[in-house]
């Protein structure tokens, strides 16, 4: 593998994981805060809010996992090498 391609792959993998985790991390924090606020205002809706929150958090976490998969492909199964 060319050293330039290897260096670019490592940098791209780092960016995929780093930038892929920023958005979902902020979104998960905001969603959790809003869920706590909603439960505090309306305790009888706790079950519905919690279920919706867990589903939403799973969808947000999948974006981070996609970034990790792209990084692993770039590092170990690089199509450009």
Swiss-Prot record:
Q: How does the protein associate with the membrane?
A: Multi-pass membrane protein
* Gene Ontology cellular component list: plasma membrane-derived thylakoid membrane; proton-transporting ATP synthase complex; proton-transporting two-sector ATPase complex, proton-transporting domain
The compartments listed are: Cellular thylakoid membrane
Q: Which domain of life is it from?
A: Bacteria
Gene Ontology molecular function, alphabetical: lipid binding; proton-transporting ATP synthase activity, rotational mechanism
- In chain numbering, where does the site feature Reversibly protonated during proton transport fall? 61
* Signal peptide (from-to): none
InterPro entries, per the entry: ATP_synth_csu_bac/chlpt, ATP_synth_F0_csu, ATP_synth_F0_csu_DDCD_BS, ATP_synth_F0_csu_sf, ATPase_proteolipid_c-like_dom, F/V-ATP_Csub_sf
Q: Which UniProt keywords apply?
A: ATP synthesis, CF(0), Hydrogen ion transport, Ion transport, Lipid-binding, Membrane, Thylakoid, Transmembrane, Transmembrane helix, Transport
Q: Where are the transmembrane segments?
A: 6-26, 57-77
Check the record and name the NCBIfam families matching this protein: ATP_synt_c, PRK07354.1
Q: Family membership, please give it.
A: Belongs to the ATPase C chain family.
- Protein name per UniProt: ATP synthase subunit c
What species is this protein from? Synechocystis sp. (strain ATCC 27184 / PCC 6803 / Kazusa)
Per the UniProt record, the lineage of the source organism begins with: Bacteria, Bacillati, Cyanobacteriota, Cyanophyceae, Synechococcales
Whichever gene encodes this chain, its name is: atpE
């Amino acid at each position: 593998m060319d050293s330039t391609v290897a260096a670019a792959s490592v940098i791209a993998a780092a960016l995929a994981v780093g930038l892929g985790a920023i958005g979902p991390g902020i979104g998960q924090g905001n969603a959790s805060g809003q869920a706590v606020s909603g439960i505090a205002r309306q305790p009888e809706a706790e079950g519905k809010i919690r279920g919706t929150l867990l589903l939403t958090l799973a969808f947000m976490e999948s974006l981070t996992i996609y970034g990790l998969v792209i990084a692993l492909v770039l590092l170990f199964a690089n199509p450009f090498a």
